[in-house]
C-alpha cells in the first residue's frame, strides 16, 4: 500500500467447482476488502485458474471492475477451452475489458512463466521464432512459486513436485529472456492500470 504498487483483486477460492457457486459473491467481497484496505476500488480482477462461468462478467461489472484478466485463449484439459476467443483484448457486453494472457495465435500455446520453466528455453525459442504469431498486447502470467520455491515444496503431491521442480530456480532468468525478446520486437512495457485506461480510451 505504501509503495503504491499496481495491484488488483484475485479470487480467494482456487477450487473451481466451489468457486462456481459463489463467484459473484466472491467478486463483490474481493472488491469490498480491497477498497477498504487500499482506499480505492480495484480496477481489475482475476478468476481462479483462468475459469469464468456464465454470469461472471455481469457480476464483475456490477462490482465495479473495469477489466478482467482471467482468460487464457488456449486449452487446459479438464479446466477450460478458450481457443475460440481472441488473443487480443476485447470488450465484453456490459463494458468489462478483457485483457487475456499471452497465447500464440497459430498454436494457442500459453506463454507463461510456469510454461517457460516447464518446457525450457530451447523449446520456446522454436515456438517464438515467428513474432507474427505473438499477440500485440502480451500479458505475462506468473505466480510467486515461479520465482521462489515454497518452504513446503517437498510436501506437495508428486504431480505438483514434478511440474514445479522443472527449472525451479530459473524463473527470473527465463522471464528476463522473454522480456529481452519482446524488447527486440519493439514492445513497450506498462502496468495493468495504464494498459486498461489506454485501451478503454480507444474503444
Language-model regions, residue ranges each:
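Distinct, well-ordered alpha-helical segments
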Residues: 1, 23, 56-61, 202
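Acidic (Asp/Glu)-rich catalytic clusters
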Residues: 1-10, 31, 61, 92, ...
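Histidine-centered divalent metal-coordination motifs
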Residues: 8-14, 143
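A short acidic, helix-capping loop that chelates divalent metal ions and anchors anionic groups
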Residues: 14-20
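An active-site-proximal "capping" alpha-helix that borders the catalytic cofactor pocket
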Residues: 23-34
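Active-site-adjacent pocket scaffolds in enzyme catalytic domains
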Residues: 40-141
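C-terminal domain-boundary segment and adjacent tail
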Residues: 121-203
Amino acid at each position: 500500500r505504501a509503495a503504491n504498487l499496481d495491484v488488483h483483486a484475485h479470487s480467494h477460492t482456487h477450487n473451481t467447482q466451489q468457486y462456481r457457486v459463489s463467484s459473484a459473491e466472491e467478486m463483490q467481497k474481493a472488491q469490498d476488502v480491497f477498497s477498504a484496505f487500499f482506499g480505492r476500488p480495484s480496477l481489475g480482477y482475476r478468476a481462479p485458474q483462468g475459469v469464468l462461468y456464465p454470469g461472471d462478467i455481469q457480476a464483475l461489472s456490477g462490482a465495479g471492475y473495469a477489466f478482467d484478466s482471467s482468460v487464457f485463449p488456449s486449452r487446459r484439459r479438464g479446466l477450460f477451452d478458450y481457443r475460440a476467443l481472441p488473443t487480443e483484448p476485447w470488450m465484453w457486453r456490459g463494458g468489462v475489458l478483457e485483457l487475456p494472457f499471452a497465447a500464440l495465435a497459430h498454436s494457442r500455446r500459453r506463454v507463461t512463466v510456469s510454461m517457460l520453466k516447464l518446457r525450457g528455453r530451447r523449446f520456446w525459442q522454436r515456438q517464438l521464432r515467428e513474432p507474427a504469431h505473438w499477440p500485440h498486447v502480451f500479458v505475462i502470467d506468473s505466480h510467486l512459486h515461479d520465482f521462489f520455491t515454497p518452504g513446503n515444496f517437498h510436501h506437495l503431491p508428486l504431480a505438483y513436485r514434478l511440474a514445479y521442480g522443472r527449472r525451479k530456480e530459473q524463473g527470473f532468468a527465463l522471464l528476463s529472456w522473454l522480456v529481452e525478446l519482446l524488447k527486440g520486437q519493439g514492445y513497450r512495457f506498462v502496468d495493468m492500470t495504464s494498459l486498461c485506461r489506454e485501451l478503454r480510451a480507444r474503444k
